[in-house]
Amino acid sequence: MAPILVIDSMVAGYGAGDILKGVNLSVEAGTVTCLIGPNGSGKSTVLKTVSGLLRPKRGTVAFRDQTINKLSPKARLLLGIVHVPQDRSLFPAMSVWDNLLMGGYMLRDQKLLKQRLDQAVEAFPICRTRAREHAGSLSGGEQKQVELARTLVLDPTLILLDEPSIGLDPKSRQVVFASIRTLCDSGRTVLLVEQNARSGLAASDMGAVLESGIVRLVASGASLLEDPQVARLYLGAASPTPDQPVTP
């Protein structure tokens, strides 16, 4: 499968400081790719550069063979790149259904809107069973499902997920990652950042280890789970230190 997203030698940061120091990463269409690494390594910054929230200082971001460095976040959204931030983005006082409708605010074609709403509800039945309840009354895992459903209304090609399981209990985390796999069943592509590396890699086709602003290792999610060094540093046995880099 050809890559849908190619990040080449990307340097990015705020002011004089660089968070990303030459990131190279390719993401194949129709797959889930998980970025793991220590806090401050630049994982969320990668998502921001792809979504347009942060312009890279050097290097390129290409989506479907088109360089998108100069495109605004809205222009990238229209191309099919949707960023779901770490913070919950639902309106708690609004109903689940009204939150879902917010995903189609740019659509003027009511027939198309209904079609996308139907697809979202089919993928995430909670949007039907809890439609009239306030979003704020749902659990964290349920709210995340509604966020993902709302993303489908935008008909994305590439979905950027920042810490989708943060604050969730193990059962809710499992449901959310199953939902993420559902997104790819229809040919969509997911690039996610996940601090819970074990859960993220288990749900992903590919994984990438980011350290000190550089991608150190790219492999299948399954092989990274079995890698003793990755397990020691990121799967609960120890914390990485500067003198313990992950090596290919």
Listing of model-derived features with the role each one plays in the protein:
Residues G59-T67, L79, L113-L117, A219:
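Conserved ABC transporter NBD signature motif
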Residues D155:
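Conserved catalytic motifs of ABC-family nucleotide-binding domains
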Residues S51:
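Helix-to-loop junction immediately C-terminal to a conserved catalytic motif
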Residues I159-E163:
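Catalytic Walker B motif of ABC-type/P-loop ATPase nucleotide-binding domains
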Residues I36-P38:
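The feature captures the beta-strand-to-loop junction immediately N-terminal to the Walker
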Residues T151-L152:
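ABC ATPase C-loop
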Residues H134-L138, E142:
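Conserved ABC ATPase signature
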